[in-house]
C-alpha cells in the first residue's frame, strides 16, 4: 500500500459490465458523464477522467470555487495517486486517473503474459504496440469504443504515414483570469500530513481550454482512424502522456474535457 495521505485501502471487486461494441463505427452523440468509471482497462482497472469533483481538497477545508473541479492528477500528492496513476476510493475500488501505469507497471510478464494479444507481436520489444509501431488496444470505454495507447498514424486514414505520439488539444490557460480573485495560480492551501500546496496552473480542471487542432486529438481525446485491429476504421480514444519544459499538457487516461462545461465530470463521444 502506498497512497500517501489517502486513508483508503484496495479491496477485491467483482465487476460485470455490459458494453455495446461500437468498434468499427463512428457514431457521435456527445454528453457529459458523472464522476466514476468511464471504461475499463485490460487488467481489470476502471478508467476515469482526472476530475476529483467539487469536494474539498483532502486534508484541508478548502473547496474549489463554484463551477470548478479539482484535478486529481495535478494534485496527486493530496489524493494519494500512486506510480500507476491511480488510487482507491472510499469503497475500496481502485481506478486510474492517468496513464503512468502503461510505462511504470505494464512492462512485465505478469501483465502482458496473461493475454496472447499482447504477446503475439511487438515493436522494439514493446508488447503494447503492434509490429508497425501503432499502439494496441488497452481497454474499452463504456460507450463501446476502444482505448489505445499513445501511438497512431500521422494521417488517420493512411497506414503508410509515420507512427507518431498522439497529443491532446487541451492547453493550459496562460493566466488565472478565469479563476476567482482569491484562487489565482499562487493560491496556497495547507494540507494535513503534507504541508502547504500551491494551487498552480492545472490544479483545476477549468485551467485547461480546448483548442481545435492544437494537438492530434479531438475534445474527447479520440479520433476516427484506421488501426491494425480495424483496417476499415473506427472511432477510438487514445491514452496520452506528454510533457515539455514549459507546461504539463496532458497525462490522462481518456480526456481532460471533464468539468469544462460545468458541474459534470466529463464528456464522452457517443
Predicted regions and their residues:
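Extended, compositionally biased non-globular segments
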Residues: 143-145, 149-270
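A general structural signal for short secondary-structure junctions and capping/turn motifs
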Residues: 7-10, 37-39, 84-89, 129-130, ...
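Solvent-exposed N-terminal domain segments of exported/luminal and surface proteins
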Residues: 1-84
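A signal for specific C-terminal beta-sheet/loop modules enriched in small/flexible residues
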Residues: 61-73, 110-126, 131-139, 162-178, ...
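Extracellular/lumenal glycan-associated surfaces
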Residues: 41-45, 90-103, 230-250
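A short, polar beta-strand/turn micro-motif
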Residues: 1-35, 98-154, 249-261
Amino acid at each position: 500500500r502506498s497512497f500517501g495521505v489517502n486513508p483508503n485501502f484496495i479491496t477485491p471487486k467483482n465487476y460485470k459490465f455490459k458494453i455495446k461494441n461500437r468498434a468499427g463505427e463512428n457514431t457521435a452523440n456527445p454528453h457529459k458523464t458523472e464522476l466514476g468509471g468511464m471504461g475499463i482497462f485490460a487488467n481489470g482497472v476502471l478508467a476515469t477522467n482526472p476530475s476529483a469533483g467539487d469536494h474539498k481538497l483532502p486534508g484541508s477545508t478548502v473547496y474549489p470555487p463554484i463551477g470548478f473541479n479539482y484535478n486529481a492528477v495535478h494534485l496527486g500528492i493530496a489524493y494519494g495517486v500512486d506510480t500507476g496513476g491511480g488510487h482507491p476510493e472510499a469503497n475500496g475500488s481502485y481506478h486510474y486517473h492517468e496513464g503512468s501505469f502503461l510505462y511504470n507497471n505494464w512492462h512485465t510478464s505478469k501483465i502482458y503474459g496473461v493475454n496472447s494479444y499482447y504477446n503475439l507481436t511487438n515493436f522494439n520489444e514493446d508488447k503494447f504496440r503492434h509490429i508497425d509501431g501503432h499502439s494496441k488496444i488497452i481497454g474499452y470505454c463504456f460507450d463501446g469504443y476502444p482505448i489505445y495507447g499513445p501511438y497512431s498514424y500521422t494521417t488517420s486514414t493512411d497506414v503508410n504515414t509515420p507512427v507518431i505520439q498522439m497529443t491532446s488539444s487541451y492547453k493550459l490557460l496562460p493566466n488565472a483570469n478565469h479563476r476567482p480573485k482569491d484562487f489565482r495560480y499562487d493560491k496556497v492551501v495547507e494540507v494535513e500530513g503534507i504541508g502547504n500546496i500551491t494551487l498552480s496552473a492545472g490544479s483545476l480542471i477549468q485551467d485547461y481550454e480546448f483548442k481545435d487542432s492544437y494537438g492530434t486529438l479531438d475534445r474527447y481525446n479520440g479520433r476516427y482512424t484506421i488501426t491494425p485491429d480495424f483496417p476499415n476504421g473506427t472511432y477510438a480514444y487514445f491514452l496520452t502522456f506528454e510533457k515539455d519544459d514549459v507546461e504539463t499538457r496532458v497525462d490522462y487516461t481518456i480526456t481532460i474535457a471533464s468539468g469544462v462545461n460545468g458541474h459534470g465530470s466529463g464528456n464522452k463521444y457517443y
